[in-house]
């Protein structure tokens, strides 16, 4: 009996470690993207009290955003109210084209992945959420729905950030 317990202890430990690492592998995908309170290639998370305006974006099952083209000024903080008007889950992810394509690959591998990043919101049908973002650099910031098949069908848009 003592020999059996000695044999089972290491096996139990190995099984527990394997299960806990698998649990962390799927989780949210906030890690590794650098989308926290620090500045990124597309700006940084904004503070609600500093938002100069609110832009409402509707997502629909025809796989489009309304509006899909938005103009902001460099340095401006915008509150995006994002509404899912459709019958399926949609998301809005802000990023560079490269970041969105990388994220698209992750979503293909983990389509049920939940977002925990200030530059992204995933919404069930009929729900709404918000993103508050400060656009610190002039240029183009892309946004897209990276649910499987949505991006490929054209569910994307742009924020043109004009110089001060």
Where are these regions (language model features)?
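N-terminal edge beta-strand
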Residues: 47-77
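Extracytoplasmic/periplasmic copper-protein system
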Residues: 26-58, 99-113, 150-164
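N-terminal signal peptide c-region/cleavage motif recognized by signal peptidases
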Residues: 20-22
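Bacterial N-terminal signal peptides that target proteins for export
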Residues: 2-12
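Extended, low-complexity, turn-rich repeat/linker tracts enriched in Gly/Pro/Ser/Thr and Asp/Glu
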Residues: 86-89
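Asparagine-centered strand-capping/turn motif at beta-strand->loop junctions
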Residues: 82-84
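Extracellular/periplasmic metallocenter environments
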Residues: 26-33, 64, 117-164
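Beta-strand signatures of extracellular beta-sandwich domains
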Residues: 91-95
